[in-house]
A protein has these predicted regions:
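Fe(II)/2-oxoglutarate oxygenase catalytic core
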Residues: 1-209, 213-244
Length: 244
């Protein structure tokens, strides 16, 4: 799916969008935040609920359930198409790309309580070393004060993982993970290994766009509902796209 990033979408809901461009960390990496993004949250929640229950993930560090969205999922796929079209001018403006292609899309819900996390799930992570890969995160159901935080690895000063520094990051991260307490839970703010450099609050119908190489983690309070019900748990739409 190719998307022209310079063409404004012909959507009536575009008028309600409230975009903000953040620059975070020492690298001043762009992060896009768009409030009131879709204007049709109840309809999207109904689409996600219709695809439940979501399957458990295998060989994936995401702390919960994820339902991939494909062409056969007509309503969900149409929503993803519209999301990409509406986000295109913001991606183009913030990251200076002419167009992009969708890699994958899914509905995701956090269901793993802090006590059951694996060591990698307790630390910030990155999605890709590809500088042209971007993550789009659409907050849908927000059961408690949560969000997304961005980090700098203290020992290496890495904020964005690239092919040039991924080996250094992984070596340090493995050593540090071995030192984490088994009951440390989800990272919250800064700790001895990672410094939080920015955070974005999870607000229903807020869209977050950032480079896949940025170190990040969900802000997941221990008191949050870890329900697998899309209307009760922390539900997001997660997209990965690549600039062409």
């Amino acid at each position: 799916m190719g998307r022209e990033a310079e063409t404004s979408p012909s959507l009536s809901l575009e008028r309600r969008m409230r975009p903000e461009l953040l620059r975070i960390g020492n690298e001043q990496s762009p992060v896009v935040v768009i409030d009131e993004f879709s204007g049709r949250l109840p309809e999207i929640l109904a689409i996600a609920e219709g695809l439940a229950p979501f399957p458990a993930l295998k060989n994936n560090y995401y702390p919960g359930l994820r339902r991939m969205i494909g062409a056969a999922d007509e309503a969900a796929n149409s929503y993803v198409e519209e999301l990409c079209s509406a986000a295109a001018p913001f991606i183009g403006g913030a990251f200076d790309i002419a167009d992009f292609s969708l890699i994958e899309a899914s509905f995701s819900i956090v269901t793993t309580p802090p006590s059951q996390l694996s060591p990698p799930q307790r630390a910030p992570h990155f999605d890709s070393t590809d500088p042209k890969q971007y993550a789009l995160l659409h907050y849908l159901s927000v059961p408690a004060a949560s969000g997304t935080a961005f980090y700098r690895q203290r020992s290496t000063s890495i904020e964005r993982v690239t092919e040039a520094n991924v080996a250094r990051f992984v070596t340090a991260a493995k050593s540090e993970a071995a030192l984490l307490s088994p009951d440390s839970g989800y990272i919250s703010g800064s700790d001895e290994f990672f410094e939080q450099i920015a955070s974005v609050e999870a607000v229903p119908d807020r869209l977050l766009i950032y480079q896949g190489g940025l170190l990040h983690s969900g802000i997941i309070p221990a008191t949050m509902s870890f329900s697998a019900d899309p209307r009760e748990g922390r539900l997001t739409t997660n997209l990965f796209v690549r600039g062409n």
